[in-house]
Regions:
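Conserved C-terminal "switch" segment of AAA+ ATPases
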Residues: 6-14, 27, 178-250, 277-281, ...
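P-loop (Walker A) phosphate-binding loop of NTP-binding proteins
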Residues: 53, 87, 155
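Pre-Walker A (pre-P-loop) alpha-helix and adjacent loop at the N terminus of AAA/AAA+ ATPase modules
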Residues: 9-56
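Walker B catalytic acidic pair
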Residues: 52, 115-116, 127
């Protein structure tokens, strides 16, 4: 398809983005990067891991987005005594009909917020992650498809690590993006304080539908990506595994494991969605750089030496982007 045709198509299908941002902005002050990353997840079918201290409007943001997109929202608070059946559902006996009937769990929603995912044991985490991967769950002996669109946003608190069950690397890899949610600016905090103490109850109205998101998804897949951009993505991911081959020998002692092929796939998809949100029908290297850290930060596993020298995965990824040749 011609790039001009794709551009026109993207312009038409991405018209809801500004309306959505304005509607969410009625409730949420700031956090534009987090909102954009969640939208990228929605447009690509990739799940999102949010890391940040309590009170940064993570839950409220997801709830507001679901209202603005007319989607079903469910929040699951993960605790040590949670069971897989509490998430996916179970079968109950109907005495009137003398049969077992399925009782669907909170996973049957469009937007699912798994709050403090690292507070539940591994069997509960794996039940959720299986649903994320397969987009279906088995209750009793019947398999049920999950609704579309389906997006899981999991949160974890970076401070309190006592009594938590850290997500293994294999499960972290299933999240398309890992977002570090930061504090608001001074001006934003003043606006938050004024808004929350004014006594006004503001909520978001629906400005888009799940059908529009489904249509936008098909357009995102058509966003043009040049061969050189594809090679650039592969070079970035390859540099996490073989830094010496890219003239980054000093990083070899700091990287224990590089990113998996999922990183290349997700960089490709996320870059297309990033371009779509800017009403562009083609991907530029800036799109790759903009979402690169969020795609790679949980996939580059550092050595103890890196931790001892207080070198973070973000530092390593930035060095990779500085040294790998831009097309």
């Amino acid at each position: 398809m011609d790039v001009r045709v794709i551009n026109e198509l993207v312009h038409k299908q991405s018209a809801f983005v500004e309306k959505l941002s304005a509607e969410v902005g009625k409730v949420i002050v700031g956090q534009k990067a987090m909102i954009e990353r969640i939208l990228i997840g929605l447009l690509t079918g990739g799940h999102v891991l949010l890391e940040g201290v309590p009170g940064l409007a993570k839950t409220l943001t997801v709830k507001t987005l679901s209202d603005a997109l007319h989607m079903r929202f469910q929040r699951i608070q993960f605790t040590p005594d949670l069971l897989p059946a509490d998430i996916v559902g179970t079968v109950i006996y109907n005495q009137a009909k003398s049969e077992f009937i399925p009782k669907k769990g909170p996973i049957f929603a469009n937007l699912v917020l798994a709050d403090e995912i690292n507070r539940a044991p591994a069997k509960v985490q794996s039940a959720l992650l299986e649903a994320m991967q397969e987009r279906q769950v088995t209750i009793g002996d019947t398999t049920h498809r999950l609704p579309e669109p389906f997006l899981v946003m999991a949160t974890q608190n970076p401070i309190e690590q006592e009594g938590t069950y850290a997500l293994p690397e294999a499960q972290l890899d299933r999240f398309m993006l890992m977002i570090k949610v930061g504090y608001p600016t001074r001006e934003e905090e003043r606006a938050i304080m004024d808004r929350m103490t004014s006594g006004m109850n503001v909520s978001a109205g629906a400005v888009a539908t799940p059908q529009e998101i489904a249509e936008a998804r098909s357009v995102v897949n058509q966003v043009y990506m040049d061969e050189k951009i594809r090679d650039y993505i592969v070079s970035i991911v390859h540099a996490t595994r073989e830094p010496k081959a890219h003239g980054l020998g000093e990083l070899s002692d700091f990287i224990q494991f590089g990113a998996s092929p999922r990183a290349s796939i997700y960089l490709n998809l996320a870059a297309r969605a990033h371009a779509f949100l800017r009403h562009r029908g083609y991907v530029t290297p800036e799109d790759i750089k903009a979402i690169g850290i969020d795609v790679l930060r949980h996939r580059v596993i550092l050595t103890y030496e890196a931790e001892a020298e207080e070198i973070t995965s973000e530092t390593v990824i930035r060095k990779l982007f500085e040294h790998v040749e831009v097309p």
